[in-house]
Amino acid sequence: MKGNFTCLVNPRCTREFEHELLKADNTKNVMIIGAGPGGLMAARTAAQRGHNVTVYDKDTHFGEVFRSAAYPMGKGELSTVISAYRKQCEVLGVTFKMGKEVSEEARPDTIVVATGSVPLTPPIEGINSENV
């Protein structure tokens, strides 16, 4: 079989040994803005490297837009991705501030903006009708 295998859930899949994840020389306070898959993966990686990580999201639910991708038939396994990332982050000591706006008072050393995507509404006639 030609080509590379990749994974929607784990970007390092099949490449774990190409770029070793090293501990940081200096521990930093890292602010992640967004609790979707990108934000949680960034939080997990930063925590694995030894940083103090806090994830902020103005929503009270993790990965709100991403979870909607699990609704179509055959895509249900996607609903477990956010839960798995969240658990991994919790084990690593990541702090979550859900339903919170970011403020200047936090004063992190580093900020990662992972505010995600917007839902795609296909251009289907009548899609906003009451019976749809």
Model-based region annotation:
Residues 32-95:
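Beta1-alpha1 glycine-rich phosphate/pyrophosphate-binding loop at the start
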Residues 33, 56, 107-116:
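Short hydrophobic core segments
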